Every structure is written in C-alpha cells, then in structure tokens.
C-alpha cells in the first residue's frame, strides 16, 4: 500500500499546512514540518534534510512504498531520497523543482536578510509572498501568509541557500522511481523550466504543465493536481 508523503518548501507559508487539500484527499498521508521552520535546527544541505526525513519516516515505521510529493526544496529532498534509497520509494511527484542550482534575480537573497532587520522591507516581503499567491483561494492564501509571518524571512533565506547548492545532474540518469513533474504555466516567479530539464533527462517521466497556475500548483489547482497524481499512480499499479 502506498504511503503518501508531502514535503513543503520555503514558499506557500514555509509550512506543511500548505498541503491541506492533499492531506484531505489522501487518508493516512503524512506532511512533516522540516526542522528550522519554527522548531529545531535547520539543515544545511538537501542531503541532510533527506537524512532527517528518512529518520522521521522510519520512526513512524514508514520504510517502503513511499510516494514522495515535494515542492521546491521539498521536491529536491524527494529527488535526493529517490536517488539515495531507490528500494524505499514507489514513486516521485515533483512540483516547481529543479535538479540544479537556482537562477535567481539579483538581490533575492539580500532582500530576505534585509526583511528580517527592517520593518518596511519586511512589509514588502509579505506583499511579495501575497502577490505570488494570486491564483490561490483567499482563505488559504491568508492562512499561508500568517504562516509566513511565523516562520519569517530568515528561514526562507536559509532554504534558498540550500537550494542554490543542490545539484543532481550527475546522478539523475540513475533514478529508478516513476516520476511525475508538475509546473504552473503562469508562475509569477518567471523561473526557467527546470521541470522540463528533469523530464528530458529521465526516460519515461511525465510532465504536466498547468495553465492558469502559478508557483504553487498543489495549492492553486488542488483538484487537477490530485487527479493527476491519482492517474499517475493508478497507471503504475
């Protein structure tokens, strides 16, 4: 029996609560809060986050048939897990995820650092987060903005640095788990098409590009994303 595991990133509140629609859709699914997102010490690399996640899952007796669904940092962790422990992973679903260091607009990291120290920049940072939620239902958007207030810009800065050092290009051809990649076609972050790069590097992978969807497909188009995951898993028994 599949064990669904949803892994969050620095966006969408920087919290596991962003997967509310998936947790309802998949009874028994899990969504850990990564260390450093209010509680615990943050990890300094995707590899260390992966080991933390594996320990967390093993402590719950979840060691096989894992379906890892990750967003941004969570997607990188899921990918690393699939590469390191292929016998434990049934399938991977990666959203807004790349296999190489991110290309960021100049000042992106500095903006988060300044937001942690300057009230006006902090306000601008929250408005930036709100703008990225333009495709999200208002109630969930407001809840995730409240999560961002708690977690704060420094946590997001640390996560960005971790992502900027992640590079799996030299191992991607060894990935064994079935792979579904999902991207919002109208992402206001205007990032490169990282998901297509992975799709082209992994034979047999599936790539879904959702229209009228931004940076957070699972929270903006939950019905479509859940259906895509259902069909992807059903096709693989």
Model regions and ranges:
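Short beta-strand/loop motif that positions the catalytic acidic residue
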Residues: 175, 181-183
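Active-site loop/oxyanion-hole signature of alpha/beta-hydrolase fold enzymes
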Residues: 18-24, 29-69, 227
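Acidic catalytic loop of the alpha/beta-hydrolase fold
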Residues: 186-190
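Conserved alpha/beta-hydrolase catalytic His-Asp/Glu region
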Residues: 103-105, 120-173
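Gly/Ala-rich beta-loop-alpha elbow adjacent to hydrolase catalytic centers
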Residues: 70-74, 78
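Short alpha-helix in the alpha/beta-hydrolase fold that links the catalytic acid
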Residues: 19, 177, 191-200
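Catalytic histidine-centered segment of alpha/beta-hydrolase-like enzymes
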Residues: 213-222, 226
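Flexible "cap/lid" loop of the alpha/beta hydrolase fold
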Residues: 83-84, 89-119
